[in-house]
Amino acid sequence: MEVQAKLKFAKISAQKCRLVADQIRGLPVEKAINLLTFSNKKAAVLIKDVLNSAIANAEHNDGMDVDSLFVSTVFVDEGPTMKRFEARAKGRGNRILKRTSHITVKVAEKN
């Protein structure tokens, strides 16, 4: 049985977040938390919070054993993009894209 947790509208691009998500896919939760704790990426903090939420959901709602959990699925989808304007020289302007993402983490028990 899989238990999931989601973080929607995270203020980070999906491309940057997927770099960290790919590292923890399939790992036991203890190793995944350890890897995320010592990572220097901003995405690692966000994914670690979602992973801790999924672990808490599994333990509290379904009574699963925390020691036997592993990260079965983790994926990052693009959220809405805010478009902003930045003034440049000689009356020109550039568009700034403020990207967001939706992070989903699923954990399951190993048999």
Swiss-Prot record:
Keywords: Ribonucleoprotein, Ribosomal protein, RNA-binding, rRNA-binding. GO terms for molecular function: rRNA binding; structural constituent of ribosome. It holds the Pfam family Ribosomal_L22. The keyword Methyltransferase does not apply. CDD domains: Ribosomal_L22. GO terms for cellular component: cytosolic large ribosomal subunit. PROSITE patterns: RIBOSOMAL_L22. GO terms for biological process: translation. Belongs to the universal ribosomal protein uL22 family. NCBIfam families: rplV_bact. This protein binds specifically to 23S rRNA; its binding is stimulated by other ribosomal proteins, e.g. L4, L17, and L20. It is important during the early stages of 50S assembly. It makes multiple contacts with different domains of the 23S rRNA in the assembled 50S subunit and ribosome. The globular domain of the protein is located near the polypeptide exit tunnel on the outside of the subunit, while an extended beta-hairpin is found that lines the wall of the exit tunnel in the center of the 70S ribosome. Part of the 50S ribosomal subunit. HAMAP family: Ribosomal_uL22_B. This is Large ribosomal subunit protein uL22. It comes from Francisella philomiragia subsp. philomiragia (strain ATCC 25017 / CCUG 19701 / FSC 153 / O#319-036).
